[in-house]
Amino acid sequence: MPPWGAALALILAVLALLGLLGPRLRGPWGRAVGERTLPGAQDRDDGEEADGGGPADQFSDGREPLPGGCSLVCKPSALAQCLLRALRRSEALEAGPRSWFSGPHLQTLCHFVLPVAPGPELAREYLQLADDGLVALDWVVGPCVRGRRITSAGGLPAVLLVIPNAWGRLTRNVLGLCLLALERGYYPVIFHRRGHHGCPLVSPRLQPFGDPSDLKEAVTYIRFRHPAAPLFAVSEGSGSALLLSYLGECGSSSYVTGAACISPVLRCREWFEAGLPWPYERGFLLHQKIALSRYATALEDTVDTSRLFRSRSLREFEEALFCHTKSFPISWDTYWDRNDPLRDVDEAAVPVLCICSADDPVCGPPDHTLTTELFHSNPYFFLLLSRHGGHCGFLRQEPLPAWSHEVILESFRALTEFFRTEERIKGLSRHRASFLGGRRRGGALQRREVSSSSNLEEIFNWKRSYTR
């Protein structure tokens, strides 16, 4: 066993002990994990929560009860009404986990440690970027499922882009979501950053926490391969910073139809500075050190590797890797000015469903870590808050998939139906306006679309990919 193997095994054993004793443990924020009641739900008993409350098309104060003790936080709108109706009909929310399985540490541990058996069949594609760096796209091609359901109009399966956590670990959560999405008729594809999960680091540059430049090129390439298919995106945990940064920077020009974030880290800087409970902090830190140790020689010219591998916290590791570089050192403040995932959140024009748990041991309690004002003020952001689920867990009794996966795919289906109805209404309006010169305007739009399509290949100045 390598020298780090014993340390990793010890950390996993401690996490297992935390999972078994979870209900008795107190989080680092001073309250018992798992004893928290959702805000606004203190006076409701379980029966009232399961009923879901008032009419589906009415909002009281931006927080609506859902089955299973969950609640939806959002700004009232037609889209919110559509999503609320879909969630209240969802069977996934009603089927809660077993009582002994609802501990936050146990759910989190199962998510990060237990494998999915059997795992999906992956076809890897390496994408060479504009600066000659490489990212990897793992297309889920199997196992083949009979009777796959088509997820969009016209018989074109939608593409589901999945973004793992920022540490590069391919977890049970990601693989389980891909298998379920494949069964439901999607084309799942997993995005891997530079140097993550076997993707070679061919240039001494890693992707900062919230820099979406590599993801932009990957999304454009996916769009090039599937120009007519709808594109949905899902991120887990710390990987949500990348997705939110992309949606904010691209705004209405994003190719994404809808997105979801599982246990997102929204206040990223505060999250790094406050630190995690020590078993998680040490576990994530050890995983990153092991992953980058193979590139220690290649990084020596740009990073103080001695300082990097001596770091004792996630913040020290992040600072050593991206702030204290030898060529262009920057301050911690400047780093987060460029990488805060919510820096351009007002520009996002894509519906985003965030699924969070009140007992999340990694992110912390929702009243400290969730920016609820974002969901109350922005019509594109929706927060599904549950009492239990841990960090990226939301597990149910086997062989049922995590209920978060079911809810995400159901919400995407509701979004598809909503947009299809909106397009039908707009189509009728355009048909009525055709007698007022709409014919000439339609011709101009058609010419612009053809021109855009003909110039699409010019976007790919790299246009080089490798498969294996």
Swiss-Prot record:
The active site is at 360 (charge relay system), 391 (charge relay system). Keywords: Phosphoprotein, Secreted, Signal. Residues 33-61 are annotated as: Disordered. It is found in: Secreted. May regulate adipocyte lipolysis and liver lipid accumulation. It comes from the Eukaryota. The keyword Repressor does not apply. Belongs to the AB hydrolase superfamily. AB hydrolase 4 family. The modification Phosphoserine is found at residue 434. The keyword Phosphoprotein applies. Gene3D superfamilies: alpha/beta hydrolase. This is Protein ABHD15. Residues 1-23 form the signal peptide. Interacts with PDE3B; this interaction regulates PDE3B's stability and expression and, thereby, impacts the antilipolytic action of insulin. It comes from Homo sapiens (Human). One of its GO terms (molecular function) is monoacylglycerol lipase activity. SUPFAM superfamilies: alpha/beta-Hydrolases (SSF53474). The gene is ABHD15. Its main location: secreted. Coiled coil: none annotated.
